[in-house]
Amino acid sequence: MNEQEKFEKRKKITKYVLITISVLFVFFMLVMPLFCIVSSSLKQGLGFYFKSVSSKYVVSALKVTLFATVIAVVINTFFGLCAAWVTTKFSFKGKQVLATLIDIPFSISLVIVGLAFLMTFGRLGWFYPVIRWFNSVFGANVRIAFAIPGVVLATIFVTFPFVSREIIPVLNAQGKDEEEAAALMGAGGFKIFFKITFPQIKWALIYGIILCTSRALGEFGAVNALSKTRGETFTLPLEIDALYMSGTESSITAAFAASSILVIIAVVVLVLRNILEYRAKKKGQEQAAS
């Protein structure tokens, strides 16, 4: 056996060893736990499963979760686009500081985020006198901490970087030549964006929105500090925690049933992401070939 054959044999062995390690890791760390959640949710039968997922508290938690997710995705899509555009198309003092601040939700403990919002908008917070003045003047009953607005704010904070961080590399790779040429030919800002910029970033934007949605649906830490009323401000992850901590067999099974909702949503999001990646890759290959 010559050296080339030995090398090919070692390469083949290495390949199968790495494949085996990867498959086993994914199976034991991801597939098996998720399968256990689904199987545990059906432990007491389909009747109990549907009764659990349609209970008053679970339905309320799902509504709060979806509401906070939709608001967070809409706001973060807009401001994510703005932040990505500013940091890639303009030069200004503090640009690096802004780019660093965008990444703060990735590096800070989410429990601290919740406490920070609580100390800002709660009864002991510096912004609470403004809320109290507004309520007294307009006869309103606006609340942020321990209310839906607090849940929404925490979700927005946690999910802010996802859209901008997907778009920024694409805008950096795109450069400014096409946009500057269009501007010299008299095209306006909106026309340049929708005709030149948007077609090149749309897949990154959609991917960022999917990641933002997925992260918002599963948020627990920051929201936990700002939500206290079950059936009113609890999100689905908080409701799952409350059911599980009840300790009874039926409530634990109900917790797994509620968890299966998030598992199903996660699988749908994953499939959608892979479809979009495939379409983007295929379109890129077609453009390269032409």
Question: What does each model-found stretch correspond to?
Answer:
Residues E3-R10, F48, I71-I102, L115, ...:
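Transmembrane-helix boundary motif in ABC transporter permease subunits
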Residues E8, L46-S54, V59, K95, ...:
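Membrane-interfacial helix termini and adjacent extracytoplasmic/periplasmic loops
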Residues R10-T14, K56, V223-L276, S290:
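Interhelical loop and adjacent transmembrane-helix boundary motif
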Residues V17-I21, M29-M32, C36-I37, G94, ...:
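C-terminal transmembrane helix and the adjacent membrane-cytosol boundary/short C-terminal tail
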Residues T20-S22, V74, I104, I108, ...:
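Transmembrane alpha-helices
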Residues F28, K63, F67-F79, A83, ...:
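Hydrophobic alpha-helical transmembrane segments of multipass integral membrane proteins
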Residues V31-F35, S39, F78-A83, I112-L115, ...:
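Membrane-embedded alpha-helices of multi-pass transport/permease systems
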Residues I37-V74, K89-F90, L243-S250:
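Periplasmic/extracellular loop-to-transmembrane helix junction in inner-membrane transport proteins
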